[in-house]
Each structure stands twice: as structure tokens, then as C-alpha cells.
Amino acid sequence: MRRAKTFFAGISLLITLTFAVAEEPQLGSSRVVFQTNYGDIEFGFFPSVAPKTVEHIFKLVRLGCYNTNHFFRVDKGFVAQVADVVGGRTAPMNAEQRKEAEKTVIGEFSKVKHVRGILSMGRYDDPDSASSSFSMLLGDAPHLDGQYAIFGKVTMGDETLRKLEELPTRKEGIFVMPVERISILSSYYYDIDGDSCEEERSLLKRRLAASYVETERWRMKCFP
């Protein structure tokens, strides 16, 4: 009888684990890299979980809207939050960037859990008010589950997030904010399923373009 109970307990555990794996969303093939002054952070998207959110954020990335933006909030063990690009950037936006940045997306809430590395949209009380600000989870936050739209996760750069967690902070209202600006110097994107040679050439061009944006910004600032 004891062996039978052990057998059925093992089967039950296997079924539970199978369902847990099945519920984990699959990442799409697109990858985005934020180059910060503390290191790179790469992330991917969950198009099957939040398709409209993914489309919106990825378009902002492709337009270069996150370049010269920053992380306005770093709460150790909780979130590192990217500022809204309208008002968060140091560089002015062109008309196309501003048009996309001022859009909001519907709240695509899901059963995906808020755990470390997850990307989750920021918003106001209105569930459909998410725009361009989003958080990278620095720990488990079950109280956010089903309340904020999850659209992707960090795929590389956890060591950079850990650096951010150790930076000096100050408290302003409910927010824990870094004392010094954590800049997103530039950004680029690539596709892990693309043709290797062509994708590498395209990736190199985007990285060079992203670097040029930051170089030009510093040139204008330091050598007027």
C-alpha cells in the first residue's frame, strides 16, 4: 500500500509539473537590448500573452524612443522601472516618435506570474492607461498578478539588474528612486531566428546606429 501511495504521489507531482511547464508562455524570436551606463539588459516578448502590448513596445524600440531614457525607479527585490519616454528622455522626440509614444494600450492581463525577470507594464488607475513605462521585476510580486500586463521577460543581463539594486536610493512618496540617473544610452534589436549572416550584418548596423545616437548626444553636450 505504501508503494502504491508513493507511486500515485509521484504521478501527481509529474502532472503538476507538466501543467506548470505548459502554462509558461513561449518567447517570440525578437530580442531587444538596452545599453545602460551599468551594462546591457536583453529581453524578449510574449506575443501570445499580450500581442497589442508587444506590438506597441516593440514599435517604440524600433523608432528609438527608449534611447536617452532612464530607469526612474529601482526598488531592491521589487522592480526596476523604465520611465515614460514622454518626459523621460534627454533627447527631443521627432513627430513619429511622439505620435507612437502618446498612445495607450488596453490592459492585457493574464495568469502569468510576476517573478524576477518578468516585464510588466506600468499604468495609472485606468486599466487601459499603459503607455511606454514598464517594470523589470527584481523579485516575486504576487500582489501584482492579474493587475498589470505582463508582456515579456529578461533573457540576459541579470548581473546588470543586480548592479542597479546596489545603487544608492532615496524615497519619494511611494517610490524608491536612484540618487543618480540610470541612463538607457541606446538600444537595438535582433531576431534569433534570422539568417545568421544577414542578421549579423543588420544587427551590426543597428548597434552602430544606437552607438552613434549616444556619441552625438555627448558631443553636443560636451563640445558645443
Give residue spans per PLM region.
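Bacterial N-terminal signal peptides
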Residues: 9-18
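Cyclophilin-like peptidyl-prolyl cis-trans isomerases
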Residues: 17-224
